[in-house]
């Protein structure tokens, strides 16, 4: 498959990130490597979305601290970004709402038609909302260029800080190449872009707990968006899926990363990291990046059992 015929993917991870660990970052890397190896996907970006303060989890430090730690953890990555939208809302947001927000945001920022897993758009079009007196995002009057994956991610990076806290309306997009020499309307090569929820097997397992998730939300998350699961502690994701009728129904929309089941980062967790910090355990350097450790010590976070 050529680059333009592959599905372009943005991986979105929601969670407490209390604190963000090396395991979280490796989850992104392992998922990207696995999707690339399938030959069907190109991962063009990753988004870390920390949960709102009102989530109510015991020991959850403020979003201000968690956002800073997340930013420190991804500062050397050229494709993973931290998004504060969820933290900046008036109250806690469901995972479904976060996915829908980012789908709408990507439509506005990139000009892509984002398709659902089950009902992919047959003719995704690249371009800009049809507003008067506006120039297409990718238009260049001198050198016509295609909106490549790198340009899409770059545009996201340029605009995210400006509009991340605004929920844009859903619109259709078209792109017209106003090339005076050709005098004709051209359509750029089609690029299909999807946002997939990235999670560990623990979140997948939570889908099986009766009453914990809204079933309508689960239908949207798994049925419309799709999930990439990176198993932890050698968990059997296939066995977990068999315990949920919705997961079984949309099992083709759930991609389980099957690489090294003994990956050292698969046993790293925020809970272990907090305990290591509370007990002065030197193994904390195996769980957290040094900039995150330095910030935690400077801010006196997780020093006692209450967080």
Curated annotation (Swiss-Prot):
User: What reaction gets catalysed by this protein?
Assistant: beta-nicotinamide D-ribonucleotide + ATP + H(+) = diphosphate + NAD(+); nicotinate beta-D-ribonucleotide + ATP + H(+) = deamido-NAD(+) + diphosphate
What membrane topology does this protein have?
Answer: Lipid-anchor
Q: Where in the cell is it found?
A: Golgi apparatus membrane; Cytoplasmic vesicle membrane; Cytoplasm; Cell projection, Axon
Positions that bind NAD(+): 16-17, 92, 95, 200, 202, 212-213, 232
**PTM annotation:** Degraded in response to injured neurite. Degradation is caused by polyubiquitination by MYCBP2 after recognition by FBXO45.
Q: Which residues form a coiled coil?
A: none
Which residues make up the binding site for ATP? Answer: 24, 271-274
Q: Which SUPFAM superfamilies would you find in this protein's record?
A: Nucleotidylyl transferase (SSF52374)
Q: Which cofactor does it need?
A: Mg(2+)
Enzyme class of the recorded protein, top EC level:
transferase
Q: Name one GO molecular function term.
A: nicotinate-nucleotide adenylyltransferase activity
Mind listing the UniProt keywords for this protein, alphabetically?
ATP-binding, Cell projection, Cytoplasm, Cytoplasmic vesicle, Golgi apparatus, Lipoprotein, Membrane, NAD, Nucleotide-binding, Nucleotidyltransferase, Palmitate, Pyridine nucleotide biosynthesis, Transferase, Ubl conjugation
How does its record describe regulation of its activity? Inhibited by P1-(adenosine-5')-P3-(nicotinamide-riboside-5')-triphosphate (Np3AD) and P1-(adenosine-5')-P4-(nicotinamide-riboside-5')-tetraphosphate (Np4AD).
Provide GO CC annotations from the record. Answer: axon; cytoplasmic vesicle membrane; Golgi apparatus; Golgi membrane; late endosome; synapse; trans-Golgi network
Query: A Pfam family matched by this chain, by name?
Result: CTP_transf_like
The signal peptide here is: none
Which GO BP terms apply? cellular response to angiotensin; NAD biosynthetic process; negative regulation of cytoplasmic translation
Which EC numbers does the record give? 2.7.7.1, 2.7.7.18
Cofactor binding mode and count: Divalent metal cations. Mg(2+) confers the highest activity.
Q: What does this protein do?
A: Nicotinamide/nicotinate-nucleotide adenylyltransferase that acts as an axon maintenance factor. Axon survival factor required for the maintenance of healthy axons: acts by delaying Wallerian axon degeneration, an evolutionarily conserved process that drives the loss of damaged axons. Catalyzes the formation of NAD(+) from nicotinamide mononucleotide (NMN) and ATP. Can also use the deamidated form; nicotinic acid mononucleotide (NaMN) as substrate but with a lower efficiency. Cannot use triazofurin monophosphate (TrMP) as substrate. Also catalyzes the reverse reaction, i.e.
Q: Which family does it belong to?
A: Belongs to the eukaryotic NMN adenylyltransferase family.
User: What is the name of this protein?
Assistant: Nicotinamide/nicotinic acid mononucleotide adenylyltransferase 2
The species this protein was found in? Rattus norvegicus (Rat)
């Amino acid at each position: 498959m050529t680059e333009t015929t592959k599905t372009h993917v943005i991986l979105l991870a929601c969670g407490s990130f209390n604190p963000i660990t090396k395991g979280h970052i490796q989850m992104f890397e392992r998922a990207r490597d696995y999707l690339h190896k399938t030959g069907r996907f190109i991962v063009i970006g990753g988004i870390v979305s920390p949960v709102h303060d009102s989530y109510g989890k015991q020991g959850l430090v403020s979003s201000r601290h968690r956002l800073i730690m997340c930013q420190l953890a991804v500062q050397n990555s050229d494709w993973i970004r931290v998004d504060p939208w969820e933290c900046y809302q008036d109250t806690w947001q469901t995972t479904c709402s976060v996915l829908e927000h980012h789908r709408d945001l990507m439509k506005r920022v990139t000009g892509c038609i984002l398709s659902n897993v089950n009902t992919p758009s047959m003719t995704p079009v690249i371009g800009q909302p049809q507003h008067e007196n506006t120039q297409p995002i990718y238009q260049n009057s001198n050198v016509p260029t295609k909106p490549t994956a790198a340009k899409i991610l770059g545009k996201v990076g340029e605009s995210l800080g400006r509009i991340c806290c605004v929920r844009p309306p859903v619109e259709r997009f078209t792109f017209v190449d106003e090339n005076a020499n050709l005098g004709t309307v051209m359509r750029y090569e089609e690029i299909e872009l999807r946002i997939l929820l990235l999670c560990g097997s623990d979140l997948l397992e939570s889908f099986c707990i009766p009453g914990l998730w809204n079933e309508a939300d689960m239908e949207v998350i798994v049925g419309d968006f799709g999930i990439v699961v990176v198993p932890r502690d050698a968990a059997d994701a296939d066995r977990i899926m068999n315990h949920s009728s919705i997961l079984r129904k949309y099992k083709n929309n759930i991609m389980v990363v099957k690489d090294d089941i003994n990956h050292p980062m698969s046993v790293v967790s925020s809970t272990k990291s907090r305990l290591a910090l509370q007990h002065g355990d030197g193994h904390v350097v195996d769980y957290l990046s040094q900039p995150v450790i330095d910030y935690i010590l400077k801010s006196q976070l997780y020093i006692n059992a209450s967080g």
